[in-house]
Amino acid sequence: MITSLEGSVRPAVYLAEDLVARGCDISIISPVILPDAESKLCEMGIKPVNLGVRHFSSAFDSSLLWFEVWMYEALFNLNSKRARDESPATINFSHVVFVPSIFWYLQGPPSLALRDIISGLSFSFKMAYAFLKPMIEYLDGRVVKRGGKFSSIRIANSKFCASMYSKFGLKVHDIIYPPLDRRIFRPSTSRPSEDYVLTYFGKETKFSVIKKIADLGVKIKAFGSKTSFIDKGILKHPNIEYLGRISTSDLVDAYSNALFTLFPFTHEPFGYIPLESMSCGTPTLTYNMQGPGEYIIDGENGWLVGSDAHMVEKAVEIWREGYPARMRRCCVKESLAFDREIYVKKWLKMLGSFSVI
């Protein structure tokens, strides 16, 4: 499902773009592709194949739209039935449509994501989840097993992500971390203002932690477009400035000038926010778990904490005392390992071993 070319779509789009540059004919198949995204894919020389699955959720609420489209597949195999006339795929980056493929790139099962994030959602969401939880978990297990049968090699986007799929009995053969375009995400200034802390507002955000930090006098700027998940009360906080959805160039500036990036999450298989921040030279304060815990090095390119209370305490400490300038240099250095060129080379090696290219 492609509503934009950002986020979880990046691994597919970046690889497709590089393969097109090498003279390959590339198609991307999706149950839903919004017109703007479709136009951009065409401009890149990628053939978009929009299966045109009808949906009732708003295209502007990508999380609900994704869940609706996933339910169609989980219950009726609807999306895969529409894709039957298409050629077998080389790589399946999707969790909502399945055709025979060599590789399946895993980015996280929805049932485990819902289990983690539900505590921060509204009462109505919690009630609906309590009723639907057994069915969602059963369907998710069935989808994962079906996806495994359609693919020969399964590759996860992090060690934590691989561990989630192993709970369903799926064998994961390798790890390839998602790519970052360091031509875009790089420090935009050599003299950052460092007069605010940057954070992200989304369905995975622990708003209670952000509010406690703001209550203690820390100036916070927040970006994000998933407004239906945002605690409306927090938007009126005097120490919180909500930027909404911002352009990539503005986001790079926001990362580059922040004192640090605050990332209190409930569920994150990989975590683009800390990585983008690192690449812009700004360390991240987050939890020592899941995806971010695999690439944040405590005291080097960020800080890892074990609890909400420790995060609040550490955020205030950094706000008041700062940190060594070397941490910014370390952030940029550590982000090199995630450059899209390295990501593409790993895939080229994989594809070459199966004589695909």
Where are the predicted features?
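Aromatic "clamp/platform" in nucleotide-sugar-dependent glycosyltransferases that forms part
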Residues: 266
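Membrane-proximal helix-turn-helix segments that form the acceptor-binding/catalytic region
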Residues: 121-154, 162
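Short acidic/histidine- and often glycine-rich active-site loop of Leloir-type glycosyltransferases
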Residues: 233, 289-299, 303-304
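Active-site donor-binding segments of glycosyltransferases and PAPS-dependent sulfotransferases
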Residues: 28-93
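Conserved catalytic-core segment of nucleotide-activated headgroup transferases in glycan assembly
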Residues: 167, 180-184, 190-233
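Conserved acidic donor-binding segment of nucleotide-sugar-dependent glycosyltransferases
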Residues: 245, 298-299, 303-309, 317-323
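A charged, aromatic-enriched C-terminal amphipathic alpha-helix characteristic of glycosyltransferases
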Residues: 322-353
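Short hydrophobic beta-strand element within catalytic cores of glycosyltransferases
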Residues: 283-286
